[in-house]
Amino acid sequence: MKDGKVRLFVFIDALGWTLTEHWNFGGGFLPVRCPVRTQFGYSAGAVPTILSGRPPAEHGQFSFFFYQPATSPFRLFRLLPARLLPAALFDRHRVRHWLSKLIKKYYGYTGYFELYAVPWERLPLLDYSEKRDLFVPGGLAPIKNLADCWAGRNACISNWRCSSDDNFAEMTARLKTGQLQYGFLYCGSLDGFLHRHIAEPDAVEAELKRYEAKVAALLETARQHYRTVEFAVISDHGMTPLAGTVDGNAALARLPLRWGKEYVSFLDATMARFWFPDPAARPAIRETMAALGHGRWLSAEEQQTFGIAFPDRKYGEEIYLLEPGWQFAPSDMGRAALPGMHGYEPEHAGSTACFLSNYVPAKRPEWIGDFFHLMTED
């Protein structure tokens, strides 16, 4: 006999509002639908925002790498001569991924950790942000996260390390016990798919239909075992097709300034972040980046509005943001541009996240941080 109530939230990384509306994702069974403003930045900052209801300036996570030589876990790289790290070998993705695993194990990091394409000689001046698992109790301490709020309840939060298919299977099994009260199903693989295939409509449609079928089956399982089911699909951002590339590293290399001495830069895919050990370097950097075009410097007011105005400027004293569709290539995250990217202005239509549900919430979410309050309200 069906009894009880379950509240289930399916998080699908990169399932943007424009995608859900274009292909009517879940339109037949999730009638309550609205666009939701993303958190400026990448998943490194957006996911903690969903898990805490706070912006990056409060929960402390924004981008993976930041300038902090005193606490850098890569200080030992200073002792390795360049000849011991030949680019032909150590710049290969598989080698870097393998080394990332070794470093993660050595330090006991439990969060997502990857070296990406950061030059070896620059790593000793950089620290890494996500050293703890964000999805477990205390993962964002001293800020409370979702796991802290659901502690002591019959709840299931998916293992982000597992595949989306495995997480659907696990949540289905938990639902069938008839005892689950709260569920957060993590699906991270659509993000990688859209990075590669966003410009291929047929492939995108087929992948979305595959996810839609899984979501529909999960909802049906919940209805078979619970009297009351509150079910929602949520996301963190969308995906924007590639429009062009900018070589910021080449422009900076032409300046008579030394990286690590007069300035420090970190080029994410869509933004360049700068610190100035020598403040006199600031005007030349600002002028050089502005001359590249296809972007602009964020004002202090915009950083405040975006929730990234860190008092210590931890993630950058200055930030240059590219226009939607443009990418830095090469960047410190990868040598080549991807067919799709996110991390643009939150107001850009392609950046917007989604909320799709079978129930009307007490207050519709306007910003992805509002998902936390939906998931934790009594």
Tell where the protein language model's regions lie, with residue ranges.
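Active-site-proximal N-terminal segment of extracellular/periplasmic enzymes that hydrolyze or transfer
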Residues: M1-Y42
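Short, solvent-exposed turn/loop segments enriched in Gly/Ser/Thr/Pro and often Arg
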Residues: R33-R54, S63
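Structural motif
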Residues: F9-F11, Y182-Y186, A232-V233, I319, ...
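Metal-dependent active-site segment of extracytoplasmic phospho-/sulfohydrolases and closely related
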Residues: R7-I12, W17, R210-A250, M375
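Short catalytic/ligand-binding loop motif for oxyanion handling, primarily in non-cytosolic enzymes
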Residues: W17-T20, E58-G60, S72, G192-H195, ...
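Acidic/histidine-rich catalytic neighborhood
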Residues: T228, H237-P277
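Active-site neighborhoods of enzymes that stabilize oxyanions during catalysis
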Residues: Y263-E377
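His/Asp/Glu-rich, glycine-adjacent segments
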Residues: R54-I198, R210, P283-A284, A290-H294, ...
